[in-house]
């Protein structure tokens, strides 16, 4: 199962999930000038980053909005990035946060688990209910795909909805967690984790630890590290026996070159060093 591949990748390479949230403004100017289109500039920037970090990060998260913003050329860069990750046998999470139901959800599943935009995992928004998740289940069962469903996110606005009390006196995120957990029991691998995981931000540690203790075989995609205030020590509390989650960093790695003199010329090396430092920081806390 795909979750076992991710588990093994964490064991071997550490917990870093490198976010390829690539804006054209992140691409060093001199490197960008080598290419005649946004598509080529973004893809080749991503390719250099991937080549430099493949052995030190567990997976890559590709946020589709950064590519959609540039229209067809951006989506071609997105497609080529996912293809290159498959070629390199790297695990790709398509950060699409889809949340529709029925036939529309079927089409989203087909779009992102097959064809041009094929990825290993996708992120989903559960707000419309489980009938927005069920159309993805055949891909989990038959094609070894996986999901990360928004549970307790790292943004400030999480309090607007996720903390609303239900009739049973629980927070909305508690109820969502229970439903995700129950659904995930159908997709548990040899690692004892499920291919239906959750997005749990590391900016509210008490709740994160509570979720970890309650849902022991739920694998976490953990945003909020670094720029949003999450630390390696806090991240370690979300893990079980050194595994059970990957920690996303995007700008902290992609833009690491900006901290170095003449870093634009070695942006890929700077990204590699930033990923290694992040990996080692997390490992020290385990």
Curated annotation (Swiss-Prot):
Pfam families from the UniProt entry: OMPdecase (PF00215)
Active site: 97 (proton donor)
Keyword Lyase annotated: yes
Enzyme Commission no: 4.1.1.23
One BP annotation, GO: 'de novo' UMP biosynthetic process
Molecular function per GO: orotidine-5'-phosphate decarboxylase activity
Gene3D superfamilies: Aldolase class I (3.20.20.70)
Pathway info: Pyrimidine metabolism; UMP biosynthesis via de novo pathway; UMP from orotate: step 2/2
Alphabetized UniProt keyword annotations: Decarboxylase, Lyase, Pyrimidine biosynthesis
PROSITE patterns, per database record: OMPDECASE
Principal EC category: lyase
Protein family (similarity comment): Belongs to the OMP decarboxylase family. Type 2 subfamily.
Protein name according to UniProt: Orotidine 5'-phosphate decarboxylase
Organism ancestry: Bacteria, Bacillati, Bacillota, Clostridia, Eubacteriales
Gene behind this protein: pyrF
């Amino acid at each position: 199962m795909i979750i076992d591949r991710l588990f093994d990748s964490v064991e071997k390479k550490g917990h870093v999930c490198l976010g390829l949230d690539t804006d054209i403004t992140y691409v060093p100017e001199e490197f960008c000038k080598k290419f005649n289109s946004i598509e080529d500039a973004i893809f080749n920037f991503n390719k250099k980053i991937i080549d430099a970090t493949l052995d030190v990060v567990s997976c890559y998260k590709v946020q589709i909005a950064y590519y959609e913003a540039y229209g067809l050329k951006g989506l071609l860069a997105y497609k080529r990035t996912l293809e290159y990750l498959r070629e390199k046998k790297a695990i790709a999470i398509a950060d699409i946060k889809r949340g529709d139901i029925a036939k529309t959800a079927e089409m989203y599943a087909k779009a992102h688990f097959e064809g041009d935009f094929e990825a290993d995992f996708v992120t989903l928004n559960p707000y419309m209910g489980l009938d927005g998740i069920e159309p993805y289940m055949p891909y989990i069962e038959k094609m070894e795909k996986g999901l990360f469903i928004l549970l307790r996110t790292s943004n400030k606005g999480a309090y607007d909805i996720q903390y609303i009390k239900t009739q049973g006196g629980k927070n909305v995120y508690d109820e969502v967690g229970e439903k995700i957990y129950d659904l995930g029991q159908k997709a548990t691998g040899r690692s004892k984790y499920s291919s239906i995981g959750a997005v749990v931000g590391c900016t509210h540690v008490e709740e994160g630890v509570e979720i970890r203790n309650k849902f022991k075989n739920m694998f976490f995609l953990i945003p909020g590290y670094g720029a949003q205030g999450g630390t390696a020590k806090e991240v370690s509390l979300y893990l079980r026996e050194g595994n059970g989650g990957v920690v996303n960093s995007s700008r902290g790695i992609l833009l690491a070159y900006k901290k170095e003199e003449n870093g634009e010329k070695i942006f890929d090396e700077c990204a590699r060093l930033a990923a290694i430092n992040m990996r080692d920081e997390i490992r020290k806390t385990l």
